[in-house]
Amino acid sequence: MKAVIMAGGRGTRIAALAGDLPKPMLPIDGRPVLERELGSLREQGVTDVLITVGHLAPAIMEYFGDGSGCSPQTGRPFGVHIEYFVEKEPLGNAGALFRIRDRLDEDFLLLNGDVMFDVDLQRFAAFHKVHGGLATLFTHPNGHPYDSGLIVADSEQRVTQWLTKEDARPQYYRNRVNAGLHILSPKLLEGNIPAGKVDLDRQILKPLAGTGQLLCYDSPEYVKDMGTPERYAAVCEDVRSGHAAARNLRRKQKAVFLDRDGTINRYVGFLRNIDEFELLPGVAQAVRKINELGWLAVVV
């Protein structure tokens, strides 16, 4: 499977930290985040990479070359084959895909160049292959679902609704958001090339909701963007502490199993209605603490 990495954005929200570096070149514990992405891909057998570049493109292209060289930071080989597409003008976060579609002859992995992730990509790809949709989103819970877009899916993981943060939402909903990793079919890029900027979510993916062709792959693994100075600092700490690596499902997971009735919620006999479900005092804070420690909280 080929990987396409979108690395052409300007990173205006983090410009104070980036300076004259493109955002994918920001260091995480001494190595550019893009180098860490390439390392994760290589370790899992994804060695054919196409990077779209724009803002400060030479900084990326001169550092990585065609992938046959070695890292200036570690001295180790990059171990991948890299091609580039240079945006002459801003094309949004998906416009470049239509310009490179002749290089995409099978389903491909799409990710942003400023995202730190440590996930089992083979498991993700296997899910996509089995379900056979046009696109699969990598989805996970986050710490602020109330102001995030929500993904609603049926029991077969087919997306039925894609709610933006402005959309009305039900009183009860699952904390499931798009993490920014995707597997896409090149069939999505057929037809006329759109003019100007193209928004991946609003123009390509969201219209697939409810058609049965958009899947979501739920995972607790680590995926976090570095769009603000605060998020960048958090990512650096998560990598240094080992928290990011520990969440990869190729590794054994630490978990706390929590009984339900009378332990985390008020006992009401046989619970029949969600409106009767009431968390006991301190439970929400305890679950948050479990999550912050990097453990899985499993309710049984």
Question: Where are the predicted features?
Answer:
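Basic, amphipathic juxtamembrane/active-site segments
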Residues: 126-130, 269-288
